[in-house]
Amino acid sequence: MSVSSERSALDRPVSLFEHAQRLHRLTPDDPLPDGGHPFPDSGGGRPEVPDEERKPALTAALRDIVASPSLPAWDLHDLCARLPINPGYAAWIREVAPEPSSQLVEVARWLVGNGTAWRAVTVGLSLLAGHAEQRDVPLLKVIGRLRFADHLALEALTQIPGAEQDVIWLAERSRHRSRLRAVKPLIGNRDPVIRGWVRSTPRELLSSDLARTISEAHGLAELLSGQPVDDALWDQAGNLLLAMTSTRNYRSEIGRASCRERV
């Protein structure tokens, strides 16, 4: 596939990456208003494909994309833009290309950085996850500011070694529940700053089992038995213990937590 950045038409709208950059300059530290809408290119309505035909249609179209090495970049983009998908279809997209070639990864990278239609960017992000590199971090942080891309961008970032602080940066500037996409992969990280951030997950986001997992992975009882214990750690411990009493996931975990008696 040709991934030349040369545009095939002068009247194309700005890319969603450029759009996200502009909005980020206006709102650098908070989620973007309206998730970044309106986009420069609305992309039209959702393609009309019956539910029972959607997966076969998507699979066939993606196989055509993967098998078309001579397809010009913008033709590829426009084909992706017409796919009957939403960001929740990432797993389906990856089923078609579970081990993408380096050429296909470059195509994915190009779609994320140059796409003007959110469906095309979604295809790029779906294929890039698990194959992104350090050089992709700035790209993912910017495109992830748009609400439709936040979960997929966080998923890709969490799989890049050394990008943990970038994961936190994006999670703190995304919709509230997106933080869970960052917290779960970071639970086992050994960096004290990152561990403190994980323990500070707002209680309304914590299920009882997730709170228990964090508490036990971080050795909460041992942390509290050490000296000195600062106010932040007491707050984190109280937050996790209260979350473990929740029955939001149909059972409380406080009685099963190994740290309950020592805490």
Task: Give the residues covered by each predicted segment.
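Buried hydrophobic core positions in alpha-solenoid tandem helical repeats
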Residues: V107-W110, V137-K141, D166-L170, W197-V198
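Extended repeat-based scaffolds of very large eukaryotic assembly and lipid-transport proteins
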Residues: M1-R135, L146, H218, L224-R262
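Hydrophobic core positions within HEAT/HEAT-like alpha-solenoid repeats
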Residues: T122-L125, K141, L154, I168, ...
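Long alpha-helical HEAT/HEAT-like repeat alpha-solenoid scaffolds in very large eukaryotic proteins
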Residues: W169-E253
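Generic helix N-cap/helix-start motif at coil->alpha-helix transitions
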Residues: I85-Y89, N114-V123, E133, G144-L152, ...
